């Protein structure tokens, strides 16, 4: 890879790492369902404005529905899972468990898409799992009642990422491809539509929320615009 590619990877890692800190701010204030919905909503708005300025609203070449469906898997479900995990786990745990996404990709590819499980892939997945287990070992202040559901939510999210990689190849790349900005916008619109009923349910039946808090709003805008919208097009 070129030097600029390494720089983009480091920037993306920083953005995704920061997202877990922002979720630790927004989730206690707004709740998991509301935080997940607002994240994808602000991401969709930011991407919509960007593509509108660039004149790229059209040109999906019959793949818009596919990007909507992809958004449920690569954004809607994972973001909901991470917001749920933020109720139970410190940000460092979620960020570390996020590193299991490549391992999930290897497993899902072998089990569901007939991808050859080579020694290199299998060895990498095993080493990755060992590394995550060592780094994310339980601390004395974290009970199993919090640890297990948090880990389960994070692993569900990374499984979605692993699945999304193969579906992107099948639904987008093998059908002629599509610009990253268009895929990102369609995905965030799809995730917004998916999470909207959960948001409505939370507003009507969930715990009361004080929407006048300024810091959570700043965090949710940063989470949606910077960590999500910018992250998906880097």
Region spans (language model):
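Membrane-interface helix caps of multi-pass small-molecule transporters
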Residues: 25, 49-52, 84, 88, ...
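Juxtamembrane helix-entry segments on the extracytoplasmic side of multipass membrane proteins
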Residues: 1-6, 29-33, 37, 59-65, ...
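Juxtamembrane helix-loop-helix junctions in multi-pass membrane proteins
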Residues: 14-44, 90, 163-191
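Alpha-helical transmembrane segments of compact multi-pass small-molecule transporters, enriched
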Residues: 19, 41-46, 97-111, 126, ...
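Transmembrane alpha-helical segments that form core, pore/gating elements
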Residues: 47, 105-106, 143-206
